[in-house]
């Protein structure tokens, strides 16, 4: 008997993830600024890496701006490159 026979799935309903909107779009949205360390640190992982947009639900354009701001902030010494 093969394990893959029978369709798998177990008769469960398909899971549809709700599409999250970009936190930087719309009114009252925070402005991406390299000096705003508190905002930028929310988009940096515990290891110091920039969190991808598929996890944070940031749009592609704003993700590029965010990455540029994080890199600029690191260069100026406001954010660490590596968190130990």
Swiss-Prot record:
Q: Where would one find coiled-coil regions in this protein?
A: none
Per UniProt, which keywords does this protein have? Ribonucleoprotein, Ribosomal protein, RNA-binding, rRNA-binding
Could you cite one Gene Ontology molecular function of this protein?
small ribosomal subunit rRNA binding
Do you know which InterPro entries this protein is assigned to?
Ribosomal_bS18 (IPR001648), Ribosomal_bS18_CS (IPR018275), Ribosomal_bS18_sf (IPR036870)
Q: Origin, by domain of life?
A: Bacteria
Task: Give an example GO cellular component term for this record.
Answer: cytosolic small ribosomal subunit
Q: Which processes are annotated in GO (biological process)? A: translation
Family, similarity comment: Belongs to the bacterial ribosomal protein bS18 family.
User: Which PANTHER family does the UniProt entry name for this protein?
Assistant: 30S RIBOSOMAL PROTEIN S18, SMALL RIBOSOMAL SUBUNIT PROTEIN BS18M
Q: What is the documented function of this protein?
A: Binds as a heterodimer with protein bS6 to the central domain of the 16S rRNA, where it helps stabilize the platform of the 30S subunit.
Q: How does it assemble?
A: Part of the 30S ribosomal subunit. Forms a tight heterodimer with protein bS6.
NCBIfam families reported for this sequence: S18 (TIGR00165)
Name the UniProt record assigns to this protein: Small ribosomal subunit protein bS18
């Amino acid at each position: 008997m093969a394990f893959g026979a029978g369709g798998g799935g177990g008769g469960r309903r398909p899971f549809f993830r709700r599409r999250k909107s970009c936190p930087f779009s719309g009114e009252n949205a925070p402005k991406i600024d390299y000096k705003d360390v508190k905002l930028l640190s929310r988009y940096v992982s515990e290891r110091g890496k920039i969190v991808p947009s598929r996890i944070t639900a940031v749009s592609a354009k704003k993700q590029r701006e965010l990455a540029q701001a994080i890199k600029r902030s690191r260069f100026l010494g406001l954010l660490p490159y590596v968190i130990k």
